[in-house]
């Protein structure tokens, strides 16, 4: 009797691990029901508007993009893929950077310094962690 009770509790404990793992799983951006968005408040009127994540992200990168001077001098060009993670609280972090040059990778990382908090992505009405791959191309003008 005692052995069967212990086995029962062990089975319950191990069966709950997949549920815990699912809660913290990062979901690809394209599978999300409601994407994250930034709430922008007009300082004069107080009106708010929702800016979709991808639009805000593009604007942020354009505004903060700088070609590293050393890369200019060495004529280094390339593409860097930044894997972004937005957690359940809407906070962005960099999960991975894939590129061929450390100077360009470092600049790609710097671009996201100070990135504001978003309203999180929702899946079935609940906040979820998501992943989004963002390419940044470093190309010198001819």
Q: Where do the protein language model's features map onto the residues?
A:
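N-terminal secretory signal peptides that target proteins for export/translocation
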Residues: 1-2
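Charge-biased low-complexity segments
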Residues: 5-8, 15-142
């Amino acid at each position: 009797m005692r052995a069967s009770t212990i086995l029962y509790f062990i089975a319950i404990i191990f069966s709950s691990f997949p549920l815990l793992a699912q809660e913290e799983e990062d979901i690809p951006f394209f599978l999300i029901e409601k994407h994250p968005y930034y709430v922008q408040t007009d300082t004069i009127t107080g009106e708010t508007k929702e800016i979709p994540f991808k639009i805000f992200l593009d604007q942020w990168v354009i505004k903060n993009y700088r070609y590293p001077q050393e890369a200019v001098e060495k004529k280094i060009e390339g593409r860097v893929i930044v894997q972004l993670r937005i957690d359940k609280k809407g906070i962005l972090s960099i999960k991975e950077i894939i590129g061929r040059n450390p100077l360009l990778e470092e600049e790609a990382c710097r671009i996201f310094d100070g990135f504001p908090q978003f309203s999180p992505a929702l899946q079935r009405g609940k906040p979820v962690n998501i992943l989004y791959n963002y390419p940044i191309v470093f190309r010198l003008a001819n």
